[in-house]
């Protein structure tokens, strides 16, 4: 009975390459035979069988259809592409310089604080992606109509910003290819239910379950 209800293989993730790093059986689901009677053993087998059916159903729902479990290079069409939302950042201001420029009739185009800015525009949402200036202007709620500052244009504007803002958004680029991210890995590599594991010769065992299997060369390191 234990051979007919196999223990699932749990996949390991290699974040540097975005590929699977082998799979091992989840022995935490094994029965403690020293304290289990026939009734308890039968009950646990029923639970394990139901769990395996749930895992196989989940794999059919979340896995992307493919002929190779872990392709060396995942095409862009099979990868979840992250689309970063526009991010607005408050820029540093130099109010003394701005007032002096206004008094001289100059148009404002930014400014700088006397001390180094402590505003950090580095963000994990922008890591690894191109950025460009956003096409949208800041909300009118950020602008006050007191006529103190002059905006870009030939005549004096009745609107003046209380704070300068910069909007960044992801630049268009070629969709990413390669390995999967951690979020997609959980969906693609559901715990594997390997049915009838002892029904064939050893060479029929899936190589991709072995941690040192190389998907590029289709070989296991240290073995012919």
Curated annotation (Swiss-Prot):
Induction: Expressed in the late phase of the viral replicative cycle.
Protein family: Belongs to the adenoviridae hexon-linking protein family.
Organism placement in taxonomy: Viruses, Varidnaviria, Bamfordvirae, Preplasmiviricota, Tectiliviricetes
InterPro entries from the UniProt entry: Adeno_PVIII (IPR000646)
Complex and partners: Interacts with the peripentonal hexons as well as the hexons in the facets. Part of a complex composed of the core-capsid bridging protein, the endosome lysis protein VI and the hexon-linking protein VIII; these interactions bridge the virus core to the capsid.
Changes after translation: Cleaved by the viral protease during virion maturation. May cause the middle segment to be shed from the capsid.
Phosphothreonine: residues carrying this PTM: 64
Gene transcribed to yield this protein: L4
One Gene Ontology MF term: hexon binding
Gene Ontology CC: host cell nucleus; viral capsid
Propeptide: 112-154
Additional detail: All late proteins expressed from the major late promoter are produced by alternative splicing and alternative polyadenylation of the same gene giving rise to non-overlapping ORFs. A leader sequence is present in the N-terminus of all these mRNAs and is recognized by the viral shutoff protein to provide expression although conventional translation via ribosome scanning from the cap has been shut off in the host cell.
Protein name: Pre-hexon-linking protein VIII
Keywords from the UniProt entry: Capsid protein, Host nucleus, Late protein, Phosphoprotein, Virion
Any coiled-coil regions, as ranges: none
Site (Cleavage): 111-112, 154-155
């Amino acid at each position: 009975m234990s051979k007919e209800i196999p223990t699932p293989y749990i996949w390991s993730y290699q974040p540097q390459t975005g590929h699977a790093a082998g799979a091992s059986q989840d022995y935490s689901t094994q029965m403690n035979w020293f304290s289990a009677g026939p009734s308890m053993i039968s009950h646990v087998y029923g639970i394990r069988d139901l769990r395996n059916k749930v895992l196989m159903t989940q794999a059919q729902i979340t896995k992307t259809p493919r002929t190779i479990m872990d392709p060396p290079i995942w095409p862009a069409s099979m990868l979840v592409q992250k689309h970063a939302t526009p991010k607005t950042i408050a820029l540093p201001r130099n109010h003394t310089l701005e007032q002096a420029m206004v008094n001289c009739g100059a148009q404002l185009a930014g400014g700088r604080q006397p001390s180094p800015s402590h505003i950090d525009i580095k963000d994990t949402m922008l890591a690894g992606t191109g950025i460009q200036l956003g096409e949208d202007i800041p909300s009118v709620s950020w602008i006050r109509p007191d006529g103190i500052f002059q905006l870009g244009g030939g005549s004096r504007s009745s609107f003046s910003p209380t704070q300068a803002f910069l909007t960044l958004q992801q630049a268009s680029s070629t969709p990413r290819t390669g390995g999967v991210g951690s979020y997609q890995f959980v969906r693609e590599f559901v715990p594997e239910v390997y049915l009838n594991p002892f029904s064939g010769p050893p060479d029929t065992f899936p190589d991709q379950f072995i941690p040192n299997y190389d998907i590029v060369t289709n070989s296991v390191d240290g073995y012919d």
